[in-house]
C-alpha cells in the first residue's frame, strides 16, 4: 500500500514527522506538504503563479503552496503512481465542528477525496500537543484494518484524537460535527511605527457539544471519527426558497 501524507502545519511539523515514522513500518509513504505553516488555508488553490517543489534531506517533498495544492499536485502530476490513501495530519490542534470549514488539514484530505482517493484527516484535540504518538498509533491500526478489509469508496473521514497517552484512550466513536459559538472579535493593535493592525480572533467555544458530537467524544477520551461529504446543499430549505422567490 502507498500512502500520501500531507498537512497544513508544514513539512517540518512534529505531528507529520511522527506520523510518517509510524506509518513507514506498515506501508510505503510519500510526503508532500507545504513549505511553511498554512493553517486555516481551507480548500484554496494557488492559481496566480507556478508552484515549486523541493526535497528535504529526509526525503519529504515541500511545496510553496497550500495543503490543497500539495495533494492536487501529488495526485495529478508529481507522483509516478497514484496513492492508495491520503492522510493529512497529525494536526497540532482540533478540527471539530465549524473548524472543518477553515482547516487546511481537512482540506488536504478533501482534495484527495475529490480526486478519487480514500482520504483521512487526523488532528489532536488541542494545541500544544504532548501525545502525537497516540494518534500515530491509532492511524497505524486504522491502516492495518483498511489493508485487511477495505472500506467501500468514497471515503472521507475526519478524525480527532484526545491529547492523552494511548493507554488512556477509551475507544472510538463515530460522530457528527458539533458547532462552535461565533469567533471572538478581531484584536486591534498598533505597531511601534504607529500603524494599526488586526489579528483574527480566537475560535469560539463549543456550543453544540452533546452526545454524538465530535466535541463530546474527545471530552470523554474517545477518538472521534466523523464521515464527511462535499455536498453543501441545504435540502430542507429548497421549497422555502422557491416559495420566497415566487412572491
From Swiss-Prot:
One GO MF term attached to the UniProt entry: metal ion binding
Keyword Lipoprotein tagged: no
Cofactor: a divalent metal cation
Keyword Hydrolase: yes
Catalytic reaction(s) noted: a ribonucleoside 5'-phosphate + H2O = a ribonucleoside + phosphate
Compartment list: Cytoplasm
Enzyme Commission identifier(s): 3.1.3.5
Record's function text: Nucleotidase that shows phosphatase activity on nucleoside 5'-monophosphates.
Protein name stated in the entry: 5'-nucleotidase SurE
Organism: Methylobacillus flagellatus (strain ATCC 51484 / DSM 6875 / VKM B-1610 / KT)
Gene: surE
